[in-house]
Amino acid sequence: MNRPRPVEKMVGIIKKLPGVGHKMAERLSYHILKMPQVEVDRLIDSIQNARRTMKCCSICCNLSEHDPCPICSDVTREKNIVCVVETPQDLIAVSKVEDYKGLYFVLGGALSPLDAVGPDDIRIDKLIKRLKRDSINEVIIATDADSKGEITAVYLADIIKILGIKVTRLGYGLPVGGDIEYADEITISRAIAGRKEM
């Protein structure tokens, strides 16, 4: 027996979420259908509210309710160092490390020639404009330790070095092929401390 069309549509939409396969989408769909209506309404409201209120910070491109975001607005942070990450989730992971007091920049992805993601598809131009505008002495490249992250790191390092800015890469306390957002604070802290100039 086939699933009812509304459920099939729901499964199709949910499985578009990252890390959600067909079976998980099916489980989530049926779970949502069993939830009390008040909980479903809360879920819908929270999604709509987040979509409505979250903005992209005009300085670092992090998601925030405010522009500029609280990190960019924090006068106690070191303004001459920028940590470049792929996603807002990576920024959150790195920001849990108390050792790092600088600023951030969220690329919005990583270069991936196989997926046709080039420099124009992520915020490299915006990063370079910021580096030229602000008095930045060092850029820490904190892209993932996978092939896409490495390609992105090398590409960025080549461009940023031309500007006369020191470029470092997180030390390899992070596992190769791993995502920064899943690393614990101690690992990220050691990676920041062990960063190397590129």
UniProtKB/Swiss-Prot annotation:
By its UniProt entry, which NCBIfam families does this protein fall under?
recR (TIGR00615)
Give the GO molecular function terms: DNA binding; zinc ion binding
Q: What is this protein called?
A: Recombination protein RecR
DNA damage recorded as keyword = yes
Similarity comment: family membership:
Belongs to the RecR family.
Every copy of the Toprim domain together lies at 80-175
Entries under InterPro entries matching the protein: DNA_Rcmb_RecR, Rcmb_RecR, Rcmb_RecR_Znf, TOPRIM_dom, TOPRIM_RecR
What's its job?
A: May play a role in DNA repair. It seems to be involved in an RecBC-independent recombinational process of DNA repair. It may act with RecF and RecO.
Task: Please indicate if the UniProt record lists NADP as a keyword.
Answer: no
Query: Which key words are in the record?
Result: DNA damage, DNA recombination, DNA repair, Metal-binding, Zinc, Zinc-finger
Q: Which PROSITE patterns match?
A: TOPRIM
